[in-house]
Amino acid sequence: MRALWTSSVYKVTYARSKPRLALLTKSFSSTPYYKLTTTELFQSNKSSLGKIKINPDRLWDTIHSTAKWTEPKKVSNDDINTAGLTRLTLSNEDKLARDWFVETTKSLGCQVHVDQIGNIFAIRPGLRGENEDMSATFAGSHLDSQPSGGRFDGVLGIAAGIEMLRTLNDNWIETEGPVGVVNWTNEEGARYPISMMGSGVWSGRISLDDAWSTKSVSPGRPVTMVKQELERIGYLGASPASYNKGVRIGAHFELHIEQGPKLEKSGQKVGVVEGVQAYKWFTVTVTGREAHAGTTDMANRFDAMHTAAEFMVEARAITGAQPGGGGGGLVTFGRLTASPGSVNTIAGKVEMSLDMRSPSDQGLAKMVGKLYDLVDRLNNAATKNGKPLHSGLGVEIREDFSSAAVKFSTEAIRCVEESAAAVLGDGHGHGEKTMQRMTSGAGHDSVCTNMHCPTAMIFVPSKDGVSHNPSEWTDKEDCATGANVLLQSVLRMDKLRKDRGDFE
């Protein structure tokens, strides 16, 4: 350790010069402060790393203060500490949250870059950070939400990343390489129906032009396109939205609420996420014939709504789901519109969204095969006398989005597991019983970063397993635990990358 002063606390800012200097601004305190590199932190006594902890109150305040940027009529109540939020991507509310992110990270000594899809990268230089092309170790997540969603989904990861930066500054820790926080654009896919859009463009799985031209699907709102809204709110950046031409990422860690019940039911505090299950999104269109509800007998109806209902029931059966149990797959119909939408008119057209998921690519492929069999069966079904049951009706299905099953990096998982054991343990790292390895049921931006850099995720419990809902909740202590695991994971990866020569 290199002692700086024993009678003062200093605020650190960074100068880009060779050799690199720390510029110090003095305030008074009796607390001794030291300046440590990540390597020195690991080389000191074993408890030193464990003493570097985030500020739980500050993290909690950050989470709840960001909830003020919401459409106020979309929350279930007015309590700022419990209400959910609606912060659709590229909305006015999203702009306010983005502005806060930029201003806050700049105040913490970060360089901020915005790319062509609106991803925001805040980078804190490291000891060996003079090369601007050097890839940083990032904590990442998203600030956008679902309509009437929760205040922890995505926000926890961003707030914990900022708390990581604050804690590094508070404790005078100088990382070997640069570290940072990234806010990914349109993770949710609620307003523009391509989830993980920003990270998808960055990774190359989605083309920039396709993303820019995606149209909004928010009911009751004007139709807009992504590029148009990026320009409107001032976040159409100049940096290439590309893993190899834009901001480079050396490793990516994402803290997130579980959004399911497993951790809470088991009494465990941390989920070490090994990967993410496969999923596909479809648009299903059923066409029939509009007719009067009072004058058309049941035998002569081409009722699109009835066929849509039959499709939904049979599609659910594809998963193998049983009452009170499951078959490994998941099917969800989240949006449905019927035309013409009159109470006394038989529906002539129904359009609905379909989300299908499975832990494996093979399992999902089998489900999709059965789905197309179902479409064929409904289009060609016959009654006992051979007359087509659905004459005048048709079912069409279009695949809109696909995400293969993902296995995260072994070395990144190890960083999380070792960090969780240390944070949850008894001072000697024995915290294994309070964590579990698990697979994420939901897609996350880490799916995309995993294509190009070591990636892992950290889960913390969700009350009653509820998410995408105003009642979404994670306790303060669990948020702090996850943030401490995130901090340690980034520091462990920073040392690992230094030891293998990433920063030479």
Task: Describe the function of each predicted region.
Residues 186-187, 193-362:
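Midchain, well-structured core segments that form catalytic/ion-binding scaffolds
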Residues 102-107, 111, 115, 121-214, ...:
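Active-site metal-coordination/substrate-binding segment of hydrolases
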Residues 72, 222-274, 312-316, 320, ...:
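Active-site-adjacent substrate-binding region
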Residues 84-89, 332-341, 353-359, 388-413, ...:
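A short beta-alpha structural unit
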Residues 37, 102-103, 292, 296-322, ...:
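His/Asp/Glu-rich mid-to-C-terminal helical/loop segments that flank catalytic regions of hydrolases
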Residues 42-46, 53-149, 168:
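Acidic/His- and Gly-rich active-site-bordering loop/insert found
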Residues 51-78, 137-141, 256, 429-484, ...:
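Zn-dependent metallopeptidase/amidohydrolase metal-coordination segment
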Residues 139, 148-188, 280-286, 296-318, ...:
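Alpha-helical metal-binding/catalytic segments enriched in His/Glu/Asp
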